[in-house]
Amino acid sequence: MLRRYLTLSFSSLLLLALLFLTGCSFVRPQFRRGFRTQFKINSIPTVSDPYHINYDLTFSLNFASNKRNTYGTGWLIDWKGDENNPEKNDPFKVYLATNLHVIDALRNNNDYEPYNKDSNNQAFNSEEITRFFSIGKYTYPSIFSELNFIINAREAFVSIQTSTIPKTAYAAVNFVETQGEDESYTDSLSTDNKRDIYADFAVIEIPLFLTNHRDYQVFNEFIKPAIETYKQLGNSSFEKKQLDQHKNDNFYMLGYPLVESSIDALILNQRRQYNNSYTEKYTPQTLTKDQRTIDLSREVPTLIQNKTENSTGSQLLVNQSLSSTSEGIIEFIKLPEFKLNYHNKSYRQYGRGFALQNTNFRPGSSGTLMLNNQKQIAGIYFGVLDFGEDVSLMSNIGVGQILRVPQKNNTRNRSIATNKSNYDLIFGDSNTTNFYAKFARQNNTHLYQMISNSKDTKLKYVNTVEKTVKASIK
């Protein structure tokens, strides 16, 4: 009875709240005028700072079509190629994790199937096709020699337009075999709600042709430092804990919300002399933005850390009235209002999430990496709950999607999970049918090489799946 009461209490409170997804599609929103925040902004972490890992791995993403301009945050999760001796003829491929709602703006006719069409298997509307993409970072502009004649600032936001439009490596839709955390609850859901589900997680592929000047700048100044930091995390970089073991975690977050700012900000765009002829497998960029576009708009991707004068990191909101358990864990299956339209089809959110105290990051920060005390990747930030004028409900509640939820090993505590709630969006498990390691294996990326060399059998589930499929074919 107590669990039901808490669940109903949480649901009713959420009906009073608005979930703001923090990947944004807008031009100069007026409500962000005079931006103020308690968090530390526009400060590059030192090497000894715990946020330095987040900084090296994290980038601002910008997608544009004829109809909209979308910003989000992404972080390095994988790559393909030797960063120390890259191929000259083949692109170096970078894989960045972000939110699914951010890559709704990625619509590429040359994308991998099934992402080269919308979720209803229909061709994209020409006005929706992605024409522009850039990847940016708050950094030292002096590393780009051409900027020494343009800008005198020691630090600035620099965004670089790549030569081609990214592709979709992974989208977390319909990713589990069994939707059964609470069978009495799921039985009451409509058939459509049971079928089409999502987690707010995706991975994009950015091909970098290193003979292209801008692509090489992205590779050399952004990606290589990120790879070096990624390797330092080691094979245990992806957290997988029982849900009740998160209560003492502290989450470090660094992202790029789009807010009014006076910082120097520039776009290094593609120029005619940089363009090469690419194979039909890739989509060259057809739209460029003037180098001063961001600077003139004054709505600038702004480096932010969940660090204040009095605290570092975010902790779970351990409050019985504001979470479906007493441990700050959200069960999305019980919140049917958590929905997303991805590529013209509606999905219902599934899985588990973190309810984060005092973590109100603004739009543009969607996709922010959540790193725990042990320097492990625990989740991905995607939005904030807002209760309007009722500050007693703690309006600054951030929400993140947990990436890996193990099978429950404590049958006595029914408020945490049941044995059908497990999933693993990265490496897969017995209940996960759609996970990133499948793509990594098929394309022999760095992550799959790590899986192959690992002694941890839990990371090798993708090989079991492939063997099972081959055996069934025989």
Curated annotation (Swiss-Prot):
Pfam families linked: Mycop_pep_DUF31 (PF01732)
Compartments, as annotated in UniProt: Cell membrane
Lipid moiety-binding region (S-diacylglycerol cysteine): 24
Topological relation to the membrane, as annotated: Lipid-anchor
Keywords for the protein's UniProt record, in alphabetical order: Cell membrane, Lipoprotein, Membrane, Palmitate, Signal
Lipidation (N-palmitoyl cysteine): 24
Keyword presence, RNA-binding: no
Entries under InterPro entries matching the protein: Mycoplasma_peptidase_DUF31 (IPR022382), Peptidase_S1_PA (IPR009003), Uncharacterised_MG067 (IPR022381)
Signal sequence interval, chain numbering: 1-23
Location (main, coarse): membrane
GO cellular component, one term: plasma membrane
Family assignment from sequence similarity: Belongs to the MG067/MG068/MG395 family.
UniProt name for this protein: Uncharacterized lipoprotein MG068
Biological source species: Mycoplasma genitalium (strain ATCC 33530 / DSM 19775 / NCTC 10195 / G37) (Mycoplasmoides genitalium)
